[in-house]
Amino acid sequence: MTDSTRSLRNCLAPAKLNLFLHITGRRPNGYHDLQSVFQLLNWGDTLHFTLRDDGRVARVTDVPGVPEESDLVVRAANLLKAHTGTAHGVDVEIDKILPMGAGLGGGSSDAATTLLALNRLWQLDLPRAELQSLAVKLGADVPFFIFGKNAFAEGIGEELAEVELPTRWFLVVTPRVHVPTAEIFSDELLTRDTKPVTIADFLAQQTSDAEWPDSFGRNDMQEVVTRKYAEVAQVVKWLYDVTPARMTGSGASVFAAFHSKHEAEAAKAKLPASWNGAVAESLNEHPLFAFAS
């Protein structure tokens, strides 16, 4: 990342994985209570920010399928601008590589990187807690990326506690299918009564003899998604022939963990050509963590 008084270049918006995802209840307003562990990855979209003196927020690159006015990046910048009353504006360039509808948190991470970067570029110096309270207005996953550490998440995903995770390499496989999150959450057969667990329960997996991620929990959405989307089911089966695997979020991406980059790359080399595969190392901290206190 490069930093100057008028621009911030090469700001990573890291992907996330849900190492497990349990749905423990449903609220009267339709939102679901969940428990999960969010894992940051050293892989994601890259954003570039250039200061404008006319107060305008503009996305200067096209993102297919995402109109500028509904882009979470633009919404995040305008939300921060309205909250603080700053006279500054910004041009935002987005190098988009994360697939949408994949369960990797791409749009949410882009929004969080925007809030963090503009907190620095616009010299706002808002504390992390204040940015998180803004972030929840943009989506349930956005506060996690502002939190900036791997986390045990509860509530609708906004109750976060830091959790230390070992370094791993991941192969993330995404079929050519978009899975709408709302469709999965509304499915009548979705499990909504998984027994709550604790951080201690999760950390105890480190001493388990079972091969990770089979050693703890499951993704409650995976059964519904694989029933509705044959392509996701095929990815899960293919990866399971190599090593234990699990879907992240509401899909469509599926991941497996490896001890080395070499092992992950070797598995990726065998992927069918119609699937998108990426090898990424785990992160312990968001690259822009220092942009809020």
Curated annotation (Swiss-Prot):
Give the enzyme's EC designation.
2.7.1.148
Q: Where is the active site?
A: 16, 141
Which pathway does the record list?
Isoprenoid biosynthesis; isopentenyl diphosphate biosynthesis via DXP pathway; isopentenyl diphosphate from 1-deoxy-D-xylulose 5-phosphate: step 3/6
Coiled coil regions in record: none
**What molecular function terms (GO) are annotated for this protein?**
4-(cytidine 5'-diphospho)-2-C-methyl-D-erythritol kinase activity; ATP binding
Q: List the disulfide bonds.
A: none
Binding sites annotated in the UniProt record for ATP? 99-109
Q: Is DNA damage one of the keywords?
A: no
| Keyword Transferase annotated | yes
Please provide an example of a Pfam family that matches this protein in its UniProt record: GHMP_kinases_C
User: Sorted alphabetically, which InterPro entries does this protein's record hold?
Assistant: GHMP_kinase_C_dom, GHMP_kinase_C_sf, GHMP_kinase_N_dom, IspE, Ribosomal_Su5_D2-typ_SF, Ribsml_uS5_D2-typ_fold_subgr
Catalysed reactions listed for this entry: 4-CDP-2-C-methyl-D-erythritol + ATP = 4-CDP-2-C-methyl-D-erythritol 2-phosphate + ADP + H(+)
- Point out the signal peptide segment: none
Q: Which UniProt keywords apply?
A: ATP-binding, Isoprene biosynthesis, Kinase, Nucleotide-binding, Transferase
**Which BP terms does GO give this entry?**
isopentenyl diphosphate biosynthetic process, methylerythritol 4-phosphate pathway; terpenoid biosynthetic process
Q: What's this protein's family per the entry?
A: Belongs to the GHMP kinase family. IspE subfamily.
Q: What role does this protein play?
A: Catalyzes the phosphorylation of the position 2 hydroxy group of 4-diphosphocytidyl-2C-methyl-D-erythritol.
Annotated HAMAP family: IspE
Q: Give the protein name, as stated in the record.
A: 4-diphosphocytidyl-2-C-methyl-D-erythritol kinase
The protein's organism comes out as Burkholderia orbicola (strain MC0-3)
